[in-house]
A protein has these predicted regions:
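Helix-to-loop junction immediately C-terminal to a conserved catalytic motif
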Residues: 49
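Conserved ABC transporter NBD signature motif
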Residues: 57-68, 72-73
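Conserved ABC ATPase "signature" region
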Residues: 97, 101, 108-126
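Conserved ABC ATPase signature
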Residues: 130-134
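Catalytic Walker B motif of ABC-type/P-loop ATPase nucleotide-binding domains
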Residues: 155-159
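ABC ATPase "signature
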Residues: 214-215
């Protein structure tokens, strides 16, 4: 199992936001992390990427926790945040160089991969641009390029469809499918439930910091007794029950 979250209790203070959260993401699997605003999705992600430390429970990637081997743990993750995080003083080219250095990638091979990604997202003529020159959608594309030029075992993608044009959404979904086929594990937080239903293998439904249900669409339909329900139907049913 690539990602294992076990009995995670945590948050931003001594009062836990997350309460015994457990789920897994296997190799070659895309898991949708679903929940209302304030349900605990961002807090869960911040624990996985190491910005927050668990109060109780554990998080492991390929059997290794952050405290056991921080370098190996962090280099196993590629993260695309909801709000792009770029260095204002660095050009697009320098952001790619920084990513190559941080992940200890072969420079020639990484740049070959980067050039393909830059072309896909129509950024190949903008290598000398600074973040101030980019729109929010273009900044999001920079984050996607930097994440997908790595060899990460786990991709964490937070609300990827906000700010992206339809063409970029199509291209991102194609990249996700490609990396899945190559064996990567992918955790995606999203409010776009129809897209999640069409692409995710499994779902983790969060409500008030707890996992209320998890499984494939068929498993969730069986749990809630509605074999024809969409993911949106099931999610609304879960909210009403709780």
């Amino acid at each position: 199992m690539t990602l294992e979250v076990t009995d995670l209790v945590g948050g931003y203070s001594q009062i836990p936001v997350l309460k015994q959260v457990s789920f897994t993401v296997a190799k070659g699997q895309l898991v949708g992390l679903i929940g209302l605003n304030g349900a605990g999705k961002s807090t869960t992600i911040n624990h996985i990427i190491g910005l927050l430390r668990p109060q109780k429970g554990s998080i492991k990637i390929n059997g290794v926790s952050l405290s056991e081997d921080s370098k190996r743990y962090k280099q196993s993750i590629a993260y695309v945040p909801e709000s792009p995080i770029l260095y204002e003083e660095l050009t697009l080219k320098e952001h790619i160089d920084l990513t190559i250095m941080a992940y200890n990638l072969d420079e020639k091979q990484a740049w070959q991969r980067a050039q393909k990604l830059l072309t896909i997202f129509r950024l190949d003529k903008k290598l000398d641009w600074f973040p101030a020159n980019f729109s929010k959608g273009m900044k999001q594309k920079v984050m996607i390029v930097c994440a997908f030029l790595t060899d990460a075992d786990l991709f964490i993608i937070d609300e990827p469809f906000l700010g992206l044009d339809p063409l970029a959404i199509r291209d991102l979904l194609a990249l996700i499918a490609q990396r899945k086929a190559q064996g990567a594990a992918i955790l995606m937080s999203t409010h776009v439930l129809d897209t999640a239903q069409n692409y995710c293998d499994k779902f983790v439904l969060l409500n008030e910091g707890q996992v209320t249900a998890s499984g494939s669409l068929a498993e969730l339909q069986a749990k809630y007794g509605n074999s024809q329900a969409t993911l949106a139907d099931l999610y609304l049913q879960m909210i009403e029950r709780n």
